[in-house]
Swiss-Prot record:
GO terms for biological process: protein refolding. GO terms for molecular function: protein folding chaperone; unfolded protein binding. Coiled coil: none annotated. InterPro entries: Heat_shock_Hsp33, Heat_shock_Hsp33_C, Heat_shock_Hsp33_N. It comes from Ruminiclostridium cellulolyticum (strain ATCC 35319 / DSM 5812 / JCM 6584 / H10) (Clostridium cellulolyticum). Redox regulated molecular chaperone. Protects both thermally unfolding and oxidatively damaged proteins from irreversible aggregation. Plays an important role in the bacterial defense system toward oxidative stress. Disulfide bonds join 236-238, 269-272. PANTHER family: 33 KDA CHAPERONIN. The gene is hslO. One of its GO terms (cellular component) is cytoplasm. This is 33 kDa chaperonin.
Length: 292
């Protein structure tokens, strides 16, 4: 079974929930970027979150960007998703290695450090919606829980996980459960109780538990209903034309310098590492068409 996102409602629509299996997507990102295990886990968690949050977008052409910037060795993470859960992303420093933390786990908290999380929703309006909050733990799931509470005023629980062994990514996924207006205190209390000691989501996924089963474990007795199930994948939208526009955007002075150098130019996409080569003749054509 491939990666996918499931969206559910429960408790007469006062709870909405999203579950994700993203093992293949995270493994592909790790391979494309040559990520260390700790960078794989950090980027994978963020990509999983973006995939689920893309199903909160209303318009077909809407886009979601999650930016994390920390003072730890990873530096930062950028992930973009469209409304169809086509996700792409990169980490600033892909080859970070740190000792395991006191629980014997990958120390993402130290790798990310303290800083901020930025969520940008581009809905095709003049200005995108931008939400900002602090990184409170660097673990990403806790940071998004805090973001939803403070920036969007939506009480939420976010769980994200990436399980890695010597062969690579063997389990990745997550869930987001949110309280909507009208949610009863009893519902909130039941969920809080179930979350105490809840198994690791990446371990559950690696053992074959589906996102639906995970959400049903959390929402049992609340009449959970599946709203939609959609595929989720690593997909970049870079093209040679887009890279040519990037070349043009560097400005007349720098473009002329590249032309006069006579060697052409090589541009590389941050998101998928695809390289685009522009010969000296290509640069000459770009200069003729765009430099007056």
């Amino acid at each position: 079974m491939g990666d996918y996102i499931v969206r559910m409602t429960a408790a007469q629509g006062t709870v909405r929930a999203f579950g994700a299996m993203t093992t293949e997507m995270v493994g592909q990102a790790a391979e494309i970027h040559g990520l260390s295990p700790i960078a794989t886990a950090a980027l994978g968690r963020t990509m999983t979150a973006a995939g689920m949050m893309s199903k909160m977008l209303k318009g077909e052409n809407d886009k979601l960007t999650i930016q994390l910037k920390g003072d730890g060795p990873l530096g930062g993470i950028v992930v973009v998703s469209d409304s169809k859960a086509n996700v792409r992303g990169y980490v600033h420093n892909p080859n970070v290695y740190l000792p395991l933390n006191e629980r014997g786990k990958l120390d993402i908290r130290t790798a990310m450090g303290y800083g901020y999380i930025n969520v940008i929703r581009d809905m095709g309006l003049k200005e995108p919606y931008i939400g900002l909050s602090q990184l409170v733990s660097g673990e990403i799931a806790d940071d998004l829980t805090y973001y939803f509470a403070t920036s969007e005023q939506v009480p939420s629980t976010v769980a994200l996980g990436v399980l890695i062994d010597a062969t690579g990514v063997i389990g990745a996924g997550g869930f987001i459960v949110q309280m909507m207006p009208g949610a009863e205190e009893e519902t909130v209390a039941t969920l809080e109780k179930r979350l105490i000691g809840f198994p690791s989501v990446s371990k559950l996924i690696s053992e074959g538990t589906t996102p639906e089963q995970i959400l049903n474990m959390l929402l049992e007795g609340m009449e959970p209903k599946i709203v939609e199930t959609v595929p989720c994948s690593f997909k970049c939208n870079c093209t040679r034309e887009r890279m040519e526009r990037n070349l043009i955007s560097i400005g007349k002075k720098d473009l002329l310098e590249i032309f006069e150098d006579g060697k052409g130019a090589e541009l590389q996409c941050h998101f998928c590492n695809t390289k685009y080569n522009f010969s000296h003749q290509d640069i000459e054509n770009i200069v003729k068409e765009n430099v007056k």
